[in-house]
Amino acid sequence: MSEHETTGEGRFSSIEIRVLGSLIEKQATSPETYPLTLNALVLACNQKTSREPVMNLSPGQVGQALRALEGQEMARLQMGSRADRWEQRVDKALELVPAQLVLMGLMFLRGPQTLNELLTRSNRLHDFEDVDQVQHQLERLISRGLALHLPRQAGQREDRYTHALGDPAQIEEILAARQQEGGGRSAGGSVSEERIEALEARIAALEARLAQLEG
């Protein structure tokens, strides 16, 4: 499967994830220019700051991702007299409150992050009082199969959190890499088989939910 193809069972490619994250971010930080034109969205996707990894997407790639997302009701085109513009529909499609939308957007743009990183990076997007509020919303997302909790590994001081809407193969790669990172530690410090099974169950539940939304 190429990078720009939509994944099956309601999953999203890395480009689609970047598009959604960029729309969510600009909705909060640049309301005067939101919804975004295609050119503005390409620039947002290719930013060299607040993006991990940095990408170099073409208008064609972003446009194809938008059409795929529109088909899954995750983005919507607003036709205008001067230019067509795009808006995200993640909050509507997944029934997210603003705090949850912001966290999903940050994880879309930068992948696995600690509670403190999410708190710091959300300061322009949402007013979280402390890390406890961040954790509470993440736990709600995890309970719905929309996010994953990744226990800390060797050389790390904190657990990390990431979204669960990407390609299942990519999620499995993250989990496998974290297992390998923890291979030099005791068995109690690595990701357990039970936790991996639980995460896979959450992924399956999310796929079923997204399939219902598409139907």
UniProtKB/Swiss-Prot annotation:
Record InterPro entries: DUF480, WH-like_DNA-bd_sf, WH_DNA-bd_sf
Residue stretches in coiled coil: none
Gene3D superfamilies recorded: Winged helix-like DNA-binding domain superfamily/Winged helix DNA-binding domain (1.10.10.10)
HAMAP family: UPF0502 (MF_01584)
Record-stated family: Belongs to the UPF0502 family.
Protein name listed in UniProt: UPF0502 protein PSEEN2299
Species the sequence originates in: Pseudomonas entomophila (strain L48)
